[in-house]
From Swiss-Prot:
InterPro entries: Cyanase, Cyanate_lyase_C, Cyanate_lyase_C_sf, CYNS_N, Lambda_DNA-bd_dom_sf. SMART domains: Cyanate_lyase. It comes from Burkholderia pseudomallei (strain K96243). It catalyses: cyanate + hydrogencarbonate + 3 H(+) = NH4(+) + 2 CO2. The gene is cynS. This is Cyanate hydratase. It comes from the Bacteria. Its EC number is 4.2.1.104.
Length: 156
Protein backbone atom coordinates (compact mmCIF):
# COMPACT_ATOMS: atom_id res chain seq x y z
CA UNK A 1 0.00 0.00 0.00
CA UNK A 2 1.26 3.49 -0.84
CA UNK A 3 2.18 5.51 2.24
CA UNK A 4 2.60 9.27 2.56
CA UNK A 5 4.66 11.38 4.97
CA UNK A 6 3.07 14.20 6.99
CA UNK A 7 6.31 16.07 7.72
CA UNK A 8 9.79 16.32 6.24
CA UNK A 9 11.63 15.13 9.36
CA UNK A 10 11.77 11.37 8.67
CA UNK A 11 12.96 11.77 5.08
CA UNK A 12 15.43 14.52 6.10
CA UNK A 13 16.95 12.20 8.72
CA UNK A 14 17.14 9.40 6.15
CA UNK A 15 18.78 11.75 3.63
CA UNK A 16 21.48 12.49 6.24
CA UNK A 17 22.07 8.74 6.71
CA UNK A 18 22.23 8.26 2.94
CA UNK A 19 24.79 11.03 2.45
CA UNK A 20 26.88 9.63 5.32
CA UNK A 21 26.78 6.13 3.78
CA UNK A 22 27.58 7.52 0.32
CA UNK A 23 30.61 9.33 1.76
CA UNK A 24 31.74 6.37 3.88
CA UNK A 25 31.55 4.03 0.85
CA UNK A 26 33.04 6.68 -1.49
CA UNK A 27 30.20 6.26 -4.00
CA UNK A 28 28.85 8.71 -6.56
CA UNK A 29 25.13 9.22 -7.08
CA UNK A 30 25.66 7.68 -10.54
CA UNK A 31 27.08 4.51 -8.93
CA UNK A 32 24.23 4.34 -6.44
CA UNK A 33 21.73 4.79 -9.27
CA UNK A 34 23.13 1.95 -11.43
CA UNK A 35 20.60 -0.86 -11.69
CA UNK A 36 17.57 1.19 -10.64
CA UNK A 37 16.28 1.80 -14.17
CA UNK A 38 15.77 5.47 -13.26
CA UNK A 39 17.60 8.67 -14.17
CA UNK A 40 20.39 9.72 -11.84
CA UNK A 41 18.60 13.06 -11.28
CA UNK A 42 15.36 11.35 -10.15
CA UNK A 43 17.16 8.87 -7.90
CA UNK A 44 19.31 11.60 -6.36
CA UNK A 45 16.21 13.71 -5.67
CA UNK A 46 14.55 10.66 -4.09
CA UNK A 47 17.59 9.93 -1.92
CA UNK A 48 17.56 13.56 -0.77
CA UNK A 49 13.89 13.23 0.20
CA UNK A 50 12.02 14.71 -2.76
CA UNK A 51 10.47 11.64 -4.48
CA UNK A 52 9.38 8.13 -3.54
CA UNK A 53 11.37 5.30 -5.10
CA UNK A 54 9.70 2.27 -6.67
CA UNK A 55 10.23 -0.87 -4.56
CA UNK A 56 12.81 -2.41 -6.92
CA UNK A 57 14.89 0.79 -7.02
CA UNK A 58 14.65 1.15 -3.23
CA UNK A 59 16.03 -2.39 -2.84
CA UNK A 60 18.94 -1.62 -5.18
CA UNK A 61 20.02 1.56 -3.42
CA UNK A 62 19.40 0.14 0.06
CA UNK A 63 21.74 -2.78 -0.71
CA UNK A 64 24.46 -0.46 -1.99
CA UNK A 65 24.18 1.83 1.04
CA UNK A 66 23.61 -0.92 3.66
CA UNK A 67 20.25 0.56 4.63
CA UNK A 68 17.88 -1.51 6.78
CA UNK A 69 14.37 -2.61 5.81
CA UNK A 70 12.76 0.36 7.57
CA UNK A 71 14.89 2.79 5.55
CA UNK A 72 14.09 0.89 2.37
CA UNK A 73 10.36 1.22 3.09
CA UNK A 74 10.74 4.90 3.98
CA UNK A 75 12.38 5.53 0.59
CA UNK A 76 9.12 4.32 -0.98
CA UNK A 77 6.87 6.78 0.88
CA UNK A 78 5.53 9.92 -0.76
CA UNK A 79 7.47 12.77 0.86
CA UNK A 80 6.52 16.28 1.83
CA UNK A 81 8.37 17.97 -1.03
CA UNK A 82 10.34 21.18 -1.02
CA UNK A 83 13.88 21.14 0.30
CA UNK A 84 14.42 24.88 0.66
CA UNK A 85 12.95 26.40 3.82
CA UNK A 86 11.15 29.75 3.53
CA UNK A 87 13.07 32.77 2.38
CA UNK A 88 16.00 33.27 0.05
CA UNK A 89 18.35 30.26 -0.11
CA UNK A 90 21.79 30.80 1.41
CA UNK A 91 23.71 27.96 -0.23
CA UNK A 92 25.65 29.57 -3.12
CA UNK A 93 24.82 26.85 -5.66
CA UNK A 94 21.11 26.84 -4.85
CA UNK A 95 21.09 30.64 -4.67
CA UNK A 96 22.33 30.85 -8.30
CA UNK A 97 19.18 29.03 -9.45
CA UNK A 98 17.10 31.44 -7.37
CA UNK A 99 19.01 34.27 -9.07
CA UNK A 100 18.37 32.74 -12.51
CA UNK A 101 14.63 32.72 -11.80
CA UNK A 102 14.81 36.30 -10.46
CA UNK A 103 16.56 37.49 -13.64
CA UNK A 104 14.95 35.26 -16.27
CA UNK A 105 11.65 34.19 -14.67
CA UNK A 106 9.53 36.82 -16.39
CA UNK A 107 11.32 36.09 -19.69
CA UNK A 108 10.65 32.36 -19.37
CA UNK A 109 7.00 33.06 -18.56
CA UNK A 110 6.60 35.43 -21.51
CA UNK A 111 8.25 33.06 -23.99
CA UNK A 112 6.36 30.00 -22.73
CA UNK A 113 3.04 31.85 -23.01
CA UNK A 114 3.95 33.22 -26.44
CA UNK A 115 4.88 29.79 -27.79
CA UNK A 116 2.33 27.60 -25.96
CA UNK A 117 -0.45 29.86 -24.69
CA UNK A 118 -1.76 30.29 -21.16
CA UNK A 119 -0.53 27.47 -18.93
CA UNK A 120 2.41 26.10 -16.98
CA UNK A 121 5.41 23.83 -17.40
CA UNK A 122 4.99 20.85 -15.08
CA UNK A 123 7.53 19.98 -12.40
CA UNK A 124 5.69 16.67 -11.89
CA UNK A 125 5.77 15.35 -15.48
CA UNK A 126 9.37 16.46 -15.67
CA UNK A 127 12.89 15.38 -16.57
CA UNK A 128 16.16 16.92 -15.44
CA UNK A 129 19.59 16.36 -16.94
CA UNK A 130 22.98 17.83 -16.07
CA UNK A 131 26.04 17.52 -18.27
CA UNK A 132 29.57 18.82 -17.85
CA UNK A 133 31.05 20.13 -21.10
CA UNK A 134 34.30 21.85 -21.97
CA UNK A 135 34.14 25.62 -22.39
CA UNK A 136 35.98 26.71 -25.57
CA UNK A 137 37.23 29.70 -23.55
CA UNK A 138 38.68 27.37 -20.89
CA UNK A 139 37.23 25.58 -17.90
CA UNK A 140 33.91 23.80 -17.86
CA UNK A 141 30.27 24.64 -18.38
CA UNK A 142 27.18 23.10 -16.84
CA UNK A 143 24.45 22.27 -19.37
CA UNK A 144 21.22 21.91 -17.43
CA UNK A 145 18.12 20.68 -19.24
CA UNK A 146 14.71 21.22 -17.64
CA UNK A 147 12.16 19.19 -19.61
CA UNK A 148 8.61 19.64 -18.32
CA UNK A 149 5.29 18.84 -19.93
CA UNK A 150 3.27 21.91 -20.90
CA UNK A 151 -0.14 21.98 -19.23
CA UNK A 152 -2.61 24.50 -20.66
CA UNK A 153 -4.97 26.42 -18.42
CA UNK A 154 -8.48 25.03 -18.95
CA UNK A 155 -11.45 27.34 -18.49
CA UNK A 156 -14.27 25.85 -16.42
Amino acid sequence: MTQSQHSQSAREALAERIVEAKTRKNLTFEQINEGTGLSVAFTTAALLGQHPLPADAARVVAAKLDLDDDAQRLLQTIPVRGSIPGGVPTDPTIYRFYEIVQVYGSTLKALIHEQFGDGIVSAINFKLDIKKVDDPEGGSRAVITLDGKYLPTKPF
